[in-house]
Amino acid sequence: MKTIKFLRLSLFAGCIALMASCSDPVKSRMGGYSYQIAKQEVTIDDTVSIVLTGEMGALQMERVKNDNILLTFNSLKGDVYTTTGRIDDDEIVLQPFERTLSVTYTVTQEDLLRPVDKTVNETYNIEVSGGAEMHDETIHFTLQYRGTGVSNDKQIVGEDILMVAKKN
């Protein structure tokens, strides 16, 4: 009788240990992250190449269903944008999303007497696409930007833009 109780208890403990070892890897990666865009080089109309100032903020990753997630980016500049994605092993495939991007750069124009520097402020509506690789406590995003000026018809393109998010 004691042997049967001991066997049942051992079997129950083994089942609990097995269920704990099969915990959901997606769930463990949900939550809050701090992000920073490290390299943000864009080209305007295939002529002007600009390295933008870095962007920092908070990223909230929530599970929607199964392996689908909702990502909310809250920039310290005040911008908030969201997208959905899908987790496939250690990779995130992002759905493209739209956001605005403000760009400031200086151009030199020839005047009658001397060159004159002119500061240009432009806003672009861009589509952001890409994916990410998940590591223990960090996520490395590789993003692409494509868009058009809000008040002009200039085109903006950015490739291999690196964003790193670290779990809080």
PLM features: residue spans?
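C-terminal motif of bacterial Sec signal peptides marking the signal peptidase cleavage site
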Residues: L18-S21
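Acidic, glycine-rich flexible loop segments
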Residues: P96-S151
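Edge beta-strand at a domain terminus
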Residues: D89-E91, T138-N168
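Hydrophobic/aromatic beta-strand elements that line small-molecule binding cavities or substrate pockets
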Residues: G57-E62, T82-I87, E91, E122-M134, ...
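Bacterial signal peptide processing site
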Residues: S23-P25
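N-terminal glycine/threonine-rich, aromatic-flanked beta-hairpin/loop signature
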Residues: D46-E91, L143-Y145
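Bacterial N-terminal signal peptides that target proteins for export
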Residues: M1-L11
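Tryptophan-anchored aromatic micro-motifs
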Residues: K27-V51
